[in-house]
């Protein structure tokens, strides 16, 4: 997205930019024909320090359950294990800020999912959560009556997206979700990646737990879905 350059003549403060490559090998990528539209209000990239309104390559996207727009599937990850009877989740500050923005945009609590096993390499489940507040490094939820490992995914619930509609922001595609007034706005997504060999070290919000990795790969390559990815790791 192009932006008007504001200010007086002269040298402005420099801004850095680093290319990102998420595909491996020389095989041609496969894109969803015709592209799609991203929900600018409900999308963001908490991993992009200082620029959460810009989606980076490696961001996993999915079609919302209603409205036909695409948004990022994973909001962030927990930074501490969740213990039964807790009413909070511990996350990074950027993740808490993004969830707080979603709550403000909705004007109410947001329905999300906490995806992970109760212990390392255990059975993964997507547990529905309602986040009523987010501040600092804390998300406020109700007691879940279960446990989850640290690094569990905070993502859209099953009722919030269309199964089999996953795609990924491709190499060097940095998608600015803000308009000229810095307000969030829907944006074109002309190259939704739905096939190729992926460097998992470059996929944003990629989990560390082996069973969660397997679970997420299953979502990306769901039977009957539109995507068909290969991964460079053996898991």
Residue positions per predicted region:
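Surface-exposed, low-hydrophobicity beta-strand/loop segments enriched in small/polar/acidic residues
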Residues: 1-235
């Amino acid at each position: 997205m192009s932006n008007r350059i504001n200010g007086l003549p002269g040298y402005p403060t420099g801004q850095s930019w680093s290319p990102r490559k998420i595909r491996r090998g020389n095989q041609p990528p496969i894109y969803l024909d015709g592209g799609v539209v991203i929900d600018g209000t409900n999308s963001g990239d908490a991993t992009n320090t200082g620029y959460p309104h810009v989606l980076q390559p490696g961001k996993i996207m999915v079609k919302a359950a209603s409205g036909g727009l695409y948004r990022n599937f994973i909001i962030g990850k927990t930074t501490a294990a969740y213990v039964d009877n807790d009413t909070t989740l511990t996350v990074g500050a950027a993740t808490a800020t993004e969830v707080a923005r979603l709550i403000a945009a909705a004007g109410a609590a947001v329905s999300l999912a906490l995806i992970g096993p109760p212990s390392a390499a255990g059975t993964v489940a997507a547990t529905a959560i309602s986040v009523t507040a987010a501040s600092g490094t804390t998300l406020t939820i109700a007691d879940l009556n279960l446990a989850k490992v640290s690094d569990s995914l905070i993502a859209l619930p099953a009722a919030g997206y269309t199964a089999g509609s996953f795609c990924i922001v491709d190499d060097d595609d940095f998608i600015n979700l803000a308009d000229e007034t810095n307000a969030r706005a829907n944006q074109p997504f002309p190259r939704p990646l739905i096939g190729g060999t992926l460097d998992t070290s470059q996929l944003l919000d990629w989990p560390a737990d082996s069973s969660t990795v397997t679970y997420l790969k299953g979502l990306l390559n769901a039977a009957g879905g539109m995507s068909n990815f290969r991964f460079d790791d053996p898991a």
